[in-house]
Amino acid sequence: DLYIYHMWDYHTPMEDIMDGLDKVVKAGKARYIGISNCFAWQLAKANFYAREHNMSEFISMQGHYNLIAREEEREMIPFCQSEQIALTPYSPLAGGRLAKQPGIMTKRLKEDTYAKFKYDQTAKMDQEIIDRVYKLAKKHQVSMSEISLAWLLTKVSAPIVGTTKLEQIDAMVKATEI
């Protein structure tokens, strides 16, 4: 029911994008539209245009946000909160970095080239946060995933999570109870 426009298209006029997405909603193929990977000014401009032309507006924003990646706090989150746009961030566990005890290497941490691209450059700076999450998890006898997701759930509508094991789903559910 929510169609998420994945990434801002710099080669297509914004008016054409909004017209096309509005047609998707009016045709009943989706109830709502959301967007991912854009700047706050782009979201504001698109929704202003949609409002002025009686079109569907973006009702959710899927940005890169977690305890390590917090750039969204600068402009996007305040904007979305002021406009009542749902926040549905991706990579809530930083590609597994906020889920694994420091020093433990998993297959995903070794092989996920996209996450390496996002996090390897700042690994030394991020380690302090990862260590703090580990200490809090140990202190409260919960998993690092639970601590990381519990923090995020105080900030956003619904994080987009991915799992490879059944027990990871349990940790995600338990995070709602912290």
Briefly describe each language-model feature range:
Residues 50-54, 77-79, 104-108, 176-178:
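Short, hinge-like loop/turn segments at secondary-structure boundaries
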Residues 81-136, 155-157:
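Glycine-rich, positively charged active-site loop/lid region within alpha/beta enzyme cores that binds
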Residues 1-71, 75:
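Glycine/proline-rich, positively charged
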Residues 41-45, 97, 168-171:
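Phosphate- and divalent-cation-binding pockets in alpha/beta enzyme and binding domains
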Residues 13, 33, 61, 80, ...:
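Conserved, mostly hydrophobic/aromatic
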Residues 39, 65-69, 91-98, 151, ...:
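Glycine-rich beta-alpha junction loops
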Residues 25, 92, 121-178:
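Conserved short secondary-structure transition element at the edge of the structured enzyme core
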